[in-house]
C-alpha cells in the first residue's frame, strides 16, 4: 500500500486530478503537523512494514544547486532548526532513479550541512519511519531559490513536474 502525503491541498491537486484512485492525505505544513498526521495513521493501523509513505511537495533550492522545476528524491534530511550541536540527520535508501539530494528541514545555512534543498516536513517523515517501521520516500519539486521573493517562485511549474514524476513511480 502506498500513502501519498502532501503538506497542502495545493501541492496535491495536480496529482489528485491525474490519479484519483491514489490514497492522498493532507498533513498540513511543518514538522508538528506531519508528526501528528503520521501518528494518527499509525494509531489507525495504516502504517507498518507493508506500507510506503511518499511525502511529496515543493522545495527551495540553495543557490541554484538544483534548478527550479527539477524533481528530486531526498535521500538525507538534516534537522537544523536546533543549535548546531543538536543537528540530527536521517537517511533512507533510494527508491527511484531521480537525482538524490540532501535537504534541510527548515532553513538555517547551506554551509552548516551542505544541503541542496530545503523543506519543512522531511526530517519528521524519516524519523517517524525509523521509529514506526514503515518505508519512507520523499519527492520534491523545486519551486524557488531559497531567499528569493515569493512573487518569483514558480509553484505551478513545480507542481506539474511533481505530478508527472509521481505518475511514473505510482
Positions of PLM-derived features:
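Extreme N-terminal starter segment of soluble prokaryotic enzymes
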Residues: 1-3
Amino acid at each position: 500500500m502506498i500513502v501519498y502525503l502532501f503538506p497542502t491541498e495545493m501541492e496535491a491537486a495536480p496529482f489528485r486530478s491525474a490519479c484519483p484512485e491514489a490514497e492522498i492525505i493532507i498533513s498540513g505544513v511543518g514538522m508538528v503537523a506531519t508528526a501528528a498526521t503520521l501518528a494518527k495513521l499509525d494509531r489507525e493501523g495504516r502504517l507498518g512494514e507493508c506500507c510506503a509513505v511518499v511525502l511529496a511537495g515543493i522545495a527551495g533550492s540553495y543557490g541554484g544547486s538544483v534548478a527550479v522545476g527539477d524533481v528530486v528524491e531526498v535521500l538525507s534530511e538534516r534537522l537544523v532548526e536546533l543549535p548546531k550541536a543538536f543537528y540530527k540527520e536521517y537517511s533512507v535508501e533510494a527508491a527511484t532513479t531521480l537525482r538524490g539530494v540532501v535537504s534541510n528541514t527548515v532553513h538555517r545555512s547551506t554551509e552548516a550541512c551542505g544541503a541542496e534543498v530545503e523543506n519543512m516536513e522531511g526530517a519528521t517523515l524519516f524519523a517517524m519511519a525509523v521509529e514506526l517501521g514503515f518505508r519512507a520516500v520523499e519527492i520534491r519539486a523545486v519551486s524557488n531559490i531559497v531567499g528569493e521573493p515569493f512573487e518569483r517562485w514558480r509553484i505551478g511549474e513545480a507542481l506539474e513536474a511533481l505530478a508527472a514524476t509521481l505518475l511514473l513511480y505510482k
